[in-house]
């Protein structure tokens, strides 16, 4: 569905809406966008939660460790919320400029939903990122891929109310169904991850 093109969107909106360029990749831009979101999440964890985990292990249970841990938890919770907000704003501006309801190159919604799906495994990912190159690292990779696969499946399947909320105006309609898919993925990740981990032992 196309609408009358509107004012030109700022450059930042295009960067965010296209998932920093990942939405330009073909084929399956949504999958590329989700994969890029996973890599960005892993990089953020490698720069924050991974070094904190090592530091906390060496310093034991201290008030300072608890305070830093809470601050880091708040930061990691804020990330998918901030990404959702930015995705709505950016998609709104791009949709307004192009007159296209939900073009395939907009993958900021995949970034938001994927980060929501990844959030439950934040500490598992943080503590195991650097084990990928060690013997048995493929098992860690399989476990890390679980939120990615579940989110992509739910994003394509679109369980209720994903189809209904796609009718919301502008960026809300672009992003809302992916947020719901990410939220649906959370309980599945929490249930399936320990089962898969036990199978891979």
Language-model regions: role of each:
Residues 2-36, 65-66, 86-118, 130, ...:
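Interhelical loop and helix-boundary elements at the membrane-water interface
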Residues 20, 41, 133-137:
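Extended, non-catalytic scaffold segments that flank or surround catalytic motifs
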Residues 191-201:
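Juxtamembrane boundary at the C-terminal end of a transmembrane helix
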Residues 38, 42-46, 57, 66-90, ...:
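Alpha-helical transmembrane segments
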Residues 35-45, 113-125, 185-193:
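Membrane-interfacial alpha-helical segments at the cytosolic side of multi-pass membrane proteins
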Residues 22, 41, 45-49, 100:
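Short helix-loop boundary/capping segments at the starts of domains
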Residues 50-66, 127, 131-132:
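Membrane-interface interhelical connector segments
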